[in-house]
Design a protein with these regions (language model features):
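Short, conserved beta-strand element in jelly-roll/cupin
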Residues: 68-83, 87-89, 97-104
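Short, surface-exposed beta-strand-loop junctions and turns on beta-sheet-rich folds
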Residues: 89-91, 135-136
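Short hydrophobic/aromatic-rich beta-strand segments that constitute the beta-sheet cores
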Residues: 55, 83-85, 139
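Short acidic-glycine-tyrosine-enriched beta hairpin
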Residues: 95-123
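A short, N-terminal "cap"/entry segment at the start of jelly-roll beta-barrel domains
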Residues: 4, 14-69
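Ligand-binding loop in jelly-roll beta-barrel domains
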Residues: 112-117, 123-146
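Positively charged n-region of N-terminal signal peptides that target proteins for export
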Residues: 1-7
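His/acidic/aromatic-lined binding-pocket segments of jelly-roll/cupin-type domains
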Residues: 65, 72-75, 110-111, 118-119
Length: 146
């Protein structure tokens, strides 16, 4: 079994464990690969129920984001990006309930994300796809909310 597959299985197990602890229903949800692939091609929601949201995202560089109640697990499947977490947001603005955005951040920890990488971002932590040299980065976002 390839390392990337092992990492995805380990992360999925962790997410299911965390989700169960947060009160997310423990019912089985099956999504066939063709729907997952179609969703990844355009971006969108794969699963959305009671505190657990799984998205397929395809994007370029963006703004700094903070989500008050959302914990993220990002699983990179294509492309590469410079990703920044933490630091102090420059001129933050509330853009929706529980969500703050800014154009940049001072300080923070920088990571170079590529295919097969997994990164977790706790709620209330600034995070930013600062640079995407491949023009787009594709990833699954597993979002857990209380």
């Amino acid at each position: 079994m390839k390392l990337a597959a092992i990492v995805v299985i380990a992360v999925a197990t962790m997410v299911v464990t965390l989700a169960a602890a947060k009160g997310v229903p423990s019912t089985v949800t099956y999504i066939p690969h063709d729907k997952v692939n179609t969703t990844m091609a355009k971006g969108g929601q794969i699963i959305g129920e009671n505190g657990l949201i799984v998205l397929a995202n395809r994007r370029g560089a963006g703004e700094v984001e903070v989500h008050e109640n959302t914990n993220h697990v990002f699983i990179i499947v294509e492309g590469e990006a410079t990703f920044v977490t933490g630091g102090t947001m420059v001129e933050p603005k509330n853009t929706a309930p529980g969500q703050i955005r800014a154009k940049s951040v001072n300080g923070g920890q920088t990571y170079h994300l590529t295919k097969g990488d997994v990164i977790t971002v706790p709620a209330k932590t600034p995070h930013w796809f600062k640079d995407v040299p491949t023009q787009t980065i594709a990833y699954y976002a597993v979002n857990l909310e209380p």
